[in-house]
A protein has these predicted regions:
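Periplasmic/cell-envelope proteins involved in peptidoglycan metabolism and beta-lactam response
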Residues: 1-325
Length: 325
């Protein structure tokens, strides 16, 4: 090709950054304080709460149970440390409660999945529905792809009975999915399956082994342990000290262990002092933004989003622990 015309490069005009560093920092702190104030005003000393019962969104509360759960769900504390040989008192107590609960739930789940006459989804408890949803939608569809979403027929009567009408059990739904070839048996291992019964047995065996080591399933278990009060707020807050998330305060720590320090009051005090931030707890609301401009010139003086993050730790080799938090 021929060059029609060419212009030699030259230096362009100067570019000036109008952001005011101090104003940027102040705006970020102001957003954090404002969010903390909103969370504190809505925080309620109840473990479980259904916001759909409220007629107006302005009356919606934040159950403190959600705050306790956020320590585990958002990995502020590390649940993997609970079962170590050097675990501290609160960690040990929580782990013992958890292991017993997990064994009971896995046993009940497997019993229902093996039972052709298991209750319909709509007749299950709220907690058991959450486990069934996790198994079907999260584990089998999204995580493993064993249940192939692109093969499922949305207008199929049995699909509607499961997903919309909720009139059948997961046992019946999965067996039907096998008959319709919605199950990818290659994901179950190297075994050859000659019948629908063998495929279903393979699915159950896979589920049982997967759930034993599934940290996301463990988080769901902890959520309901906290909602029921089986794992207490005092135990969770004590673990914050045991794992060094906050500097050890012997008086407060021992008070949490022996019940003299109330976990709800503790959470409120840490939010008020911003030792715990809205961004860490990730309760609603937990994010905000602000743009400050000079009204005379239109220059942007501050442009802030909360919570902020260090993009250097999320590029090239990603810092996964930082990403999760």
């Amino acid at each position: 090709t021929d060059t029609v015309s060419m212009t030699d490069p030259k230096a362009g005009n100067d570019v000036y950054l109008t952001i005011d560093k101090n104003l940027q920092i102040s705006a970020y702190k102001l957003l954090e304080e404002k969010l903390a104030g909103i969370v504190l005003s809505k925080l309620s000393n109840v473990l479980d709460y259904d916001p759909s019962a409220e007629k107006d969104t302005k009356y919606i509360k934040i159950p403190v149970g959600d705050a306790y759960n956020s320590f585990i769900a958002n990995e502020i504390i590390d649940m993997k440390k609970f079962g170590r040989t050097d675990a501290k008192p609160a960690e040990q107590a929580v782990y013992n409660t958890f292991t017993q609960k997990k064994a009971e739930i896995l046993s009940e789940l497997m019993a229902q999945l093996q039972n052709e006459n298991a209750p319909a989804y709509k007749d299950l408890s709220k907690e058991m529905k959450a486990y069934m949803d996790y198994i079907c939608d999260t584990l089998l569809k999204q995580t493993t792809g064993i249940l192939m979403s692109d093969k499922i027929e949305a207008e199929d009567e049995t699909q509607i009975a499961w997903a919309t009408q909720e009139t059948i059990s997961l046992n019946r739904y999965l067996n039907y999915a096998i008959s319709k070839n919605w199950i990818d048996t290659s994901k179950l291992g190297d075994s050859a399956y000659s019948s629908s019964e063998e495929i279903y047995s393979g699915v159950l065996a896979y589920l049982e082994e997967y759930l034993k080591e599934d940290s996301n399933f463990d988080k769901l278990l902890y959520k309901y342990l906290i909602k029921s009060g089986s794992v207490t707020g005092e135990q969770v807050c004590a673990i914050v000290y045991e794992q060094g998330i906050l500097p050890m305060d012997d008086s407060t720590y021992n008070g949490l262990l022996n019940g003299k320090t109330n976990a709800f009051s503790w959470i409120k005090s840490k939010l008020e002092s911003l030792e715990l931030t809205p961004g860490e707890l990730a309760l609603e609301p937990c994010s905000a933004g602000a743009v400050v401009t000079n009204p005379n010139t239109g220059e942007v003086l501050a442009c802030v989003s909360y919570p902020g993050y260090d993009n250097n730790r999320l590029s090239n080799v990603m810092d996964r622990s930082y990403y999760v938090k």
